[in-house]
Amino acid sequence: EKLRQIEASNMVLEKEPVDLLELAQAVKTAFEPELAKKKLTCMVTGESAIISGDQKRLHHVIFNLVSNAVKYSTESGQILIDIHNLGKNVQLTVKDQGIGIPKEDIPLIFERFYRTDRSRNRKTGGAGIGLTIVKAIVLAHGGNISVESVKGCGSCFTVVLPKN
């Protein structure tokens, strides 16, 4: 249902001042039990960065990116969430040391229901729509999202959002 609303471009943003650094810290706190279970370290670095955005939807973006980082990280790995002001924009990166994404799959990961390895469905769960929703929310805010990854060496998702 959520995906249908987003695809129909019915996303109404309830904009207010949102500090992405505070939001990232709140998401990290929500993941503490899972981080401890997998012996993962998660650090939030950077600076306070306030944008005009929909707090609930931006929380969803960070939550989904961190969820994927936790899900695909190997035990004792590290996850880094970094927030920086870049002129009229804010850059958010979520970097992990997980299993990475094969090069040929990178152009497809934001597609609806796409899974890089269907054999993982049972083990890691998920319907393959998380990144599709994340991308739609980022685009609705006038931003963009990209990923750099090397299979076996982790992934780095970068979101750039306008401050206004």
Residue ranges of predicted features:
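Short conserved segment of the HATPase_c
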Residues: 101-115
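Conserved glycine-rich
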Residues: 142-143
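Conserved micro-motifs of the catalytic ATP-binding
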Residues: 8-13, 46, 50-53
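Short helix-loop "hinge" at the ATP-lid/N-box region of the Bergerat-fold HATPase_c
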Residues: 69-70
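Short conserved segments within the C-terminal catalytic ATPase subdomain
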Residues: 9, 34-44
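Short beta-strand/loop element within the Bergerat-fold HATPase_c
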Residues: 76-88
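A conserved beta-strand-to-alpha-helix junction within the catalytic ATP-binding
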Residues: 14-29
